[in-house]
Amino acid sequence: IDAPTWDPESLGGMSRHIYESMAAVDPEAVWLQMGWLFYADPTHWTQENIRAFLRSVPQDRLLMLDYFCEFTEIWKQTERFYGQPYLWCYLGNFGSNTMLAGNFRTVAERMEEVFSEGGDNLRGVGSTLEGFGVNQPMYEFVLDKAWETGLSDNEWIDRLADRRTGHRDATARALWRTLCDSVYTLPSHTGHSTLTNAHPSLEGNWHWTTKPTVGYCFSTLWHLWEQLLTVESDRDTYRFDVVNIGRQVLGDSFLTLRDRFTEAYKRHDLPAMEHEAALMREVLADLDRLTACHAEFSLGRWLDAARSFGSNEASKRYYETNARTLI
């Protein structure tokens, strides 16, 4: 909302009229509203303004989504949304994210806290993801925890490892615990991806859409990938994990190679530049070969699924164009 005025009375009038327009069409209407606007513009959305905006809607006719709780919890800043019902939500992916990301232990602690301190107007847990695919276990955890509140986090991790390998395996259990403690430590953010997705540049990450930030040492994930490859499993989820973690390992290594290439460039060392360039091309080729090992990473599958919505060639091309635009 870019309000013409930011006084509490005017904001309350806006929310009241929005609800009344809904109720005029459906007396049972419930307004579903993201809490993101309060986080995005804290200068204007003071506590007084938030209170006026929320309390001008009849109680229980407004349901708030606390949109990005792994990073900022609005319920804590607004006296639990001043009594209006709300959902605690995990976002996890802003739509352009291809990194292994998610703050597992923090999410666990925050969910436990909202269950105990969130008030009677907490209606449940949700997910506000804008993309999906590469961090499946984080979403499994959030939605499982909404129901299995008596299960310890480490027990849940062990069960996850068992499900993804198809049997109980000590190595798989240990590496998944390490993943949750050492790799899944930072929340996702906009443009979270490796430099393999970026336009070539000697320094930096080219654009906000390609931020290769991680909260772990590259060697940690490399060793976990090596351990995963020693596990015996014929499960599709296991193969997905091998490809997914390996994809991240290769993407991380590309940053190191790019930086070494830049150092050689600054030294005017052409042989070293050619060597690092060859290694970067090899990583890109390896990445292509690896992701071809699982259909979830297939461009062809993505495009075929999009084209299947079309009823003729023109509409099929339309849906394919949209599918290509999304990525």
For the regions a language model picked out, list residue spans one by one.
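Membrane-targeting and insertion segments and their boundary/processing signals
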Residues: 99, 130, 228-235, 247
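Short, solvent-exposed, charged loop/turn and helix-capping segments
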Residues: 230-242, 290-305
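Mature extracytoplasmic or organellar-lumen-exposed domains after removal of signal/transit peptides
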Residues: 221-222
